[in-house]
């Protein structure tokens, strides 16, 4: 769980892994452990939300850690996990600001967060660094959503040049860009 922040969760994957290690554990037992971790406020569960169907889905949830320091203590710090860590930070910040947070499903694509608060809805994509290779993956799920709710791309990019290049590629007025550091400080 700590090694997979930002990824969808499957109890079957856990039970299959343990079975290969010579241990037997049911999916229900895995979920019991997860509920216990949630009750102890060590993890938070984000369920999937079908954006087109406007309904909660029962599978492929994600779990985020309440304290990333625990993760670093258990598995160590890894530079290559920074994208998942950033996603975890954004999730916790949305909760702190009073949003109810889901992960979004838009056809076959994923929107990192669908955040709801009273009459507001906000769609958020979190990306460590926007590159020509990942720009389409980050923007397409937001562009495929035709409602008028706010859409935000959070990235660690801070150079205005980067944002201008992206706007040239995706010339739409429906997106906000904000360096994640500044967004976190609001």
Label the model's feature ranges.
Residues 1-121:
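Accessory nucleic acid-recognition modules appended to NTPase machines
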Residues 64, 124, 152-154, 168-170:
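Hydrophobic/aromatic beta-strand patches that form the interior of the parallel beta-sheet core
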Residues 106, 148-165:
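Nucleic-acid nuclease catalytic cores
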Residues 111-112, 132-134, 160-163:
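Short active-site-adjacent structural elements
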Residues 120-131:
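Active-site ExK catalytic segment of metal-dependent nucleases
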Residues 130-140:
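Active-site-adjacent loop/helix micro-motif of nuclease/hydrolase catalytic cores
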Residues 140-149:
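Arginine/glycine-rich "motif VI" loop of SF2 helicases in the C-terminal RecA-like domain
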Residues 158-186:
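Domain-level recognition of nuclease-like catalytic cores that cleave nucleotide substrates
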